[in-house]
Design a protein with these regions (language model features):
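Short gly/pro/ser/thr-enriched loop/turn and capping motifs at secondary-structure boundaries
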Residues: 6-7, 26-29, 55-59, 81-83, ...
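A conserved active-site cap/scaffold subdomain adjacent to cofactor or substrate pockets
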Residues: 50, 68-137
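Internal helical hairpin/lid segments
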Residues: 111-203
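Extended hydrophobic packing segments that form well-structured cores
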Residues: 181-254
Length: 254
């Protein structure tokens, strides 16, 4: 589960090459960064990292720049905010006029966050509020951000399922850690995988359609046989609708 497990496997098997596939937003990037720092400090040559960490702000901007966006507000990701803080989300109300509430994960957290967004909309306010203040500091986890800045660098661009190429939306290993970069060591070619034509995850993410309005929802696309990213992840909107809301198929207007 931990990248340190991959490092341990490399340490215990010096005759084998071990590649850790690093994924996730800023939530998981610090643990990868600390693992790479340890690998460098211990001099473990058979350990490398295939870095596919992504960043939260560029895809949010891409969504907000979409001309067909139909989202009135954002429940901010509490897990990402524990690392980056509340400050990076200020551009949403400042530049796009939409409220943001950073939320915890308990049912009462989510309910309160929705209430806070609705209150902002009702009162004509537009700001970043931090419902998850018991965990999320405004400036984030400074130590984690410092380690990430040392180990990672921004990629020029990165391709997202349903959203296409987004500039500087993902991380690679910095030059100081090139010896542990699997892309460098193994000359990994760039591979493009086209989005399935029937998949409408992009429209779901932008609020253009509800998950159950997708042509393949619940038939060709299920959690067991997912076509799109919104169904692959248990946190995805389509997976949530499939598991908990398949029969609530009426649009609600606020």
């Amino acid at each position: 589960y931990s990248p340190l497990d991959a490092l341990r496997i490399a340490r215990e098997n010096p005759d084998r090459e071990v590649v850790f596939f690093a994924i996730g937003f800023e939530t998981t990037a610090p643990s990868t960064a600390l693992t790479l720092k340890r690998a460098k400090a211990e001099g473990i040559p058979n350990f490398t990292c295939m870095c596919n960490h992504v960043t939260i702000v560029p895809p949010l901007r891409a969504l907000l720049d979409s001309p067909d966006l139909r989202l009135d507000g954002f429940i901010g990701p509490g897990h990402v905010a524990t690392v980056v803080g509340a400050r990076p989300f200020q551009f949403i109300p400042a530049d796009y006029g939409r409220p943001v509430v950073i939320s915890g994960f308990e049912p009462v957290d989510l309910l309160q966050s929705v209430q806070m967004i609705l209150r902002q909309l009702r009162e004509g306010r537009c700001e970043v509020e931090n419902q998850y203040s018991r965990v999320v500091p405004h400036e984030g986890n400074l130590r984690a951000l410092e380690v990430m800045a040392e180990v990672f660098a921004l990629r020029p661009h990165f391709e997202w399922r349903g959203l296409g190429f987004i500039s500087q939306s993902a991380l690679r290993l910095s030059d100081a850690y090139a010896d542990f970069d699997a892309e460098v060591r193994y000359s990994v070619p760039g591979v493009r995988v086209a989005d399935p034509k029937a998949c409408q995850c992009g429209e779901v993410l932008k609020g253009v359609i509800k998950p159950w309005e997708c042509k393949v929802f619940g038939s060709a696309c299920t959690p067991e046989h997912a076509i799109g990213t919104c169904m692959v992840s248990p946190e995805g909107a389509c997976a949530a609708y499939y598991n908990y809301g398949r029969f609530a198929r009426e649009r609600e207007v606020v």
